[in-house]
Amino acid sequence: MQIETLYDVMQWTKNIHQQLHVFAAHCALENDSERSELLLEYISSHEKKMERVIRQFEDNGNSNSNALNTYCRHFYEKTAIPIHLTGEHPFEKMDTDEIAIATLEYHKNIVGLFEYLQNCSSAPSVTEFLSNILSLEEAEKRLLARNMKQIDDL
């Protein structure tokens, strides 16, 4: 996917959440460990929810099209996040701790990208938009971490 505008970053973020949902759901079916299966099912449902939330955020942001049309290609290129999107996913061979760490790493990188974009922004509408999405992603990352810990404690 070519990233040129903030709208493209939002599409990319939504795609990451969607792919994590699909991979976690698939790996939950393939995993032999009941604990890992529970964790992957939770991650799948959480990522599906995040995909919907990002879509709603985009829809609401369309009313402020100036922010979404902001050019940010060179910022994205400096902070591109590698993600495994095709074929076999490593979740299939991971234990619960490794799954949790990998999932939180994806979210940490997404938060880092939005922090970087926010710090580079000078337009108030763009800064506000990024601040809102950043707050959402940070809150969801904390919720994900807390709930994964509770599943691990079962």
Predicted regions and their residues:
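Alpha-helical bundle segments that constitute or directly flank the non-heme di-iron/ferroxidase center
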Residues: M1-N31, T96-C120
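Membrane-interacting alpha-helical segments
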Residues: M1-Y7, H84-D97, K149-L154
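Alpha-helical transition-metal enzyme core signature, strongest for iron centers
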Residues: M10-A24, L40-I54, E58, H107-I110, ...
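Short loop-to-helix capping motifs
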Residues: D32-E34, A123-P124
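Short alpha-helical linear motifs
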Residues: E34-R35, N60-L68, I151-L154
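Leucine-rich amphipathic alpha-helices with coiled-coil/heptad-repeat character
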Residues: I54, E58-G61, S65, Q118, ...
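Carboxylate-rich helix-loop segments that flank metal/cofactor sites and access channels
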Residues: N60-M94
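Preference for long, well-ordered alpha-helical segments
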Residues: Y106, I110-Q150, L154
